[in-house]
């Protein structure tokens, strides 16, 4: 295994063996078909980056994602505080555009929207993007790739 950042040989240090995806609430009959993935970490002795040793294909993680940001009161309070700081520090206003990658159900974006700052969310989970859109938070259900960034620059007034 090589470091994702500097390509140095990694040193594994912790493993939980094979684990199912989080928040996958299965019926008893489906448990025997549940996919499990290696969940282990490694340390890079050169750049000190701690990283997972295996990456789950994003399409498997986000097909039907079940975590919704807006269900946590403490996270919503954090979103408000973060928005207040960013609005002041960056002098955001009606001519700005706040683009959030992995925007989930739009909990953070709604803090900017309610004060009239234009927003756009990008989240690969189609079910969550659909919910965000139904709440008036414009959200594109896509993975944020280089090609998609170019598309945004050409079509969504993102510079």
Language-model regions: role of each:
Residues 136-149:
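Conserved SAM-binding strand-loop segment of SAM-dependent methyltransferases
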Residues 118-123:
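Conserved SAM-binding motif I beta-strand of class I
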Residues 77-95:
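Conserved alpha-helix/loop element of class I SAM-dependent methyltransferases that forms part
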Residues 125-127:
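Conserved SAM/SAH-binding beta-strand->alpha-helix loop
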Residues 94-104:
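Conserved class I S-adenosyl-L-methionine
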Residues 105-117:
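Conserved SAM-binding loop of SAM-dependent methyltransferases across substrates and taxa
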Residues 150-159:
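A short acidic, Gly/Pro-enriched loop at the edge of an enzyme's catalytic core
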Residues 1-74:
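N-terminal juxtadomain amphipathic helix
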């Amino acid at each position: 295994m090589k470091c994702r950042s500097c390509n140095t040989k990694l040193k594994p240090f912790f493993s939980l063996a094979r684990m199912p995806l989080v928040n996958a609430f299965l019926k008893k009959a489906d448990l025997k078909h549940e996919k499990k993935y290696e969940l282990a970490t490694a340390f890079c002795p050169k750049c000190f980056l701690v990283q997972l040793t295996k990456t789950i294909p994003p399409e498997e993680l986000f097909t039907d994602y079940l975590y919704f940001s807006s269900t946590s009161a403490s996270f919503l309070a954090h979103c408000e505080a973060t928005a207040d700081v960013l609005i002041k520090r960056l002098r955001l206003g009606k001519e700005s555009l706040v683009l959030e990658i992995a925007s989930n159900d739009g909990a953070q974006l709604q803090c900017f929207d309610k004060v009239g700052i234009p927003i756009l969310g990008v989240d690969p989970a189609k079910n969550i993007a659909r919910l965000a859109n139904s709440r008036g938070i414009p959200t594109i259900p896509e993975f944020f790739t280089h090609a998609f960034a170019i598309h945004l620059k050409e079509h969504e007034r993102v510079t």
